[in-house]
Amino acid sequence: MTGTATLGGTLVALPEPGTYYLGEQFNFIRADGGVSGQFAKTDFSAFSPFLQFSLAYGANGTRIDVARGASLASAATTPNQRAVAGAADVLAINQGLPKPLTQLFPQQVGGVLDGLSGELHPATALALVEGSRYVRDAALSRRAGATAPGADAGDATGAWVQALGGNSKLDGNANTARTEANSNGLLVGIDREFSGWQVGVLAGTGRTDVKQQDRRAKSKIDNTHFGAYASHTWGGFGLRGGVAWSKHEVKSTRDVAFAGFSDSLSARYDARTRQAFIEAGYRFGGPEAGLEPYLQVARVEVDLKQINERGGAAALHGEVDDTGTTVATAGLRFDKGLKASFQQDSWLHLRGGVGYRRASGDRNQVANLAFANSSTTFVVEGAPIADNAVVAELGLSAWLTPRQQLDLGYSGQYGSESRDHSANVRWSVRF
C-alpha cells in the first residue's frame, strides 16, 4: 500500500485450508510510507497449539513468523505414542512429517501417532511365536507303537501328510493394537520305528497373514519348515521331543493417512524361527481307553532381519529385538475306542484333552525404529501374548486299513490376552 500504516487493536488470524504454516514467513502488511504502532493483542487460537506465531515489525512492513509450538509428545497418551512423538518432534521441518503433523489439534494426534508407529513389526514376531505350535504339535503327535488293532507292532516305516489351518488373535491393550493372524500349511514326514524308538523328519510350507485393522497394516508371510523328532515308550511312560526350523519371507504394507498427508509403505524382509521341544506323559489304561497326564516344554526363538520400508516421509527403518519365549504346558489327555457291539476291536477312537499353558520370557516384543532420513530411533511394542492360557484339543482317529490311518483334530488356546484355534487333517501309512 502507499502511504503510512498505523497498527493497533487486536490481530485475529484465521487458517487457510490446504496451507502449511510451520517454518513459513507471511508478509501481511507492506506500506511505502512506513509502519507505525503495534497490535495490542494477537489471536491465533484458530490454529493448532503445535504452532507458535510471532510478529516481526519493520520500518515498512510487518510479518508473521511460524515456528514449532507445543511438542507433539505433550498430546500423546500411551508409551508407543510418546515414543513416536519424541522422534517426530526432532525431525527437520523439511523432512515431510512436521508440517502436516503440526496442523493437527491435540485430540487428533493420538490416532495419527499410532498409525505412524510401525508396531506391526514387533507384533509379527509374536505372531510367529504363537504360530510355531502348529509344527510342534504335528511332530509330538507322532508316537512310537501306534498300530492298528491286530497289526504287527514290530519295526516299521511310516509316512504322513497333514493339512492345517489356524486363527490366532492378540487382543492388544491401551498401548497396542489387536493383531490377528490366519495360517494355513501342509506338512509331510517320514519316520522309522526300531527297538521301541520312533525317529523321523518333517518338512512343509505354509502362509500366514497378519493384520492390524486399527493400524491399517498387514503382513503376508510365506513359511518353509524343517524338523526332526523322536519318541520312545517304556510301558505306560512315553517321552517325545524334537527340533524345528522355519524360514519366513515377510511382505508388509502400511497405509498412513490423516488431514493433509497420506503415504503407502511396504517392506520385505526375512525372519527365522528355531524351536526345541520335549514332552513326557504316562498313559493309564488299555487299547480301548486311557488317560495320560503330560508335561510339555518348548523354547521358541524368532529373529527378524533388518526392516527398510519403501514409501514417503512416514517410511521406517530399524529392527525388532530377537524374541525368546519358553512355553510350558501341563495337562491331561484321554482316548476312547468307539465300536459297535459286534466288533471285537475299535477302529475309531475319540481323543481329547485339556491343559494349562504358561508363557515366559519375551511376551512383549519391541522394535527400534526411525523415520526415513533420520537417525533418531524410537521404541514401540507389539500386542503381547498371554502369559497364562487354557489349552484344549479334540479329535477323531480312524484306521482305514491295518496300515492307513486318518486323523481329524481341533486344538485351541484361550487366554485373557490372546486366543488361538486350529484344525488339521492327517493321513498316515505304515509299510
Q: Across the structure, where does each feature detected by a protein language model lie?
A:
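Composition- and surface-driven signal marking solvent-exposed, interaction-prone regions
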Residues: 1-3, 16-18, 24-27, 41, ...
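Residue-level detector of buried hydrophobic side-chain packing
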Residues: 5, 26-30, 64, 161, ...
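Structured core elements
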Residues: 6, 12, 63-65, 160, ...
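Outer membrane beta-barrel translocator domains of Type V secretion systems
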Residues: 94-291, 407-431
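Extracellular, surface-exposed repeat/solenoid domains
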Residues: 1-107
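Short glycine-enriched loops at secondary-structure junctions
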Residues: 243-247, 299, 356
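Outer membrane beta-barrel transmembrane domains
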Residues: 274, 310, 314-431
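Internal active-site segments that recognize and position negatively charged phosphoryl groups
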Residues: 289, 294-300
